[in-house]
Amino acid sequence: STIPHIFFHTLVVDTSRAFDDNIAISKQDGMNKVKDYNYVMTTVDEFCRILEEMYTRGYVLVSIYDVASYETQADGTQVMKHQPIYLPEGKKPFVLSVDDVSYYEYMTGHGFASKLVVGEDGTPTSEYTNSDGSLSYGSYDVVPILDDFVETHPDFSYRGAKGIIALTGYEGIFGYRTSDFWYNSNCDYFDQYFSWNLENNLKKKQTMYQPNPNIEQDKESAKQVAQACRDDGWLFASHTWGHNKVGDSGSYERFESDSRLWDREVKPLLGDVDIIIYPQG
């Protein structure tokens, strides 16, 4: 049988901001984002109703490692093997992931959560910036909302499974601006990764660069969030460092450079990751 994979982006909390042509303007390039948000985003209310509907229809969240895992052969090689999943009759497994949990700068002020933080109980929760600039903390995005749902519907999760958090790295992770490449004035390895189009990329860096004086503290905060997510049952995946559509454009050299940069800037914050979720499919 097939096991569906359902994925989401960061959830829209305040529709009055996200879908307002006068508010949802990217501060980076001046582009109106309403059409994009309407096309690829889900609201908090929609997400909650989707979870309820899937639960009613008998779907059960499973880990991707419940579906298949590595088995070591006699010669030392490893192969992927399907794993048995034991669910009650009438139940159907599915895998869930959430892309781009970086809370990109262009989304600032548009009615989305602003970052993931570690809550008072040690589990991941959301920081949300209200329209008046004040901060609230709670279930404003996929991770804490799904956690809440599983807590009240434990039979929705197989063996404590949660979802996969797919992360890029070019603006950091979880809402923390952790990329030395973009945010550290002392970064000295730009040309090591972008030699394939160095002149144009140097020009782009000059327009994109925004220093973060708190970058080292942000890295530590991101590590704490990563550990809290892992302890809570969440998995991590690479979404490529630069959100590159793999195999459709660019060279192998470009993909290799991107992968090495992800390993350099994101892996130290997350730990080992062996899943990749391709941007744009």
What are these regions (language model features)?
Residues 1-27, 31-40, 96-102:
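Boundary/entry segment of secreted carbohydrate-active catalytic domains
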Residues 6-18, 74, 79-80, 87-94, ...:
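Metal-dependent polysaccharide deacetylase catalytic core of the NodB/CE4 family, i.e.
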Residues 29, 34, 83-85, 223:
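Short, well-ordered helical secondary-structure segments
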Residues 40-43, 135:
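Aromatic-acidic/polar surface patches that form glycan- and anion
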Residues 43-80, 217, 267:
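C-terminal domain-boundary segment and adjacent tail
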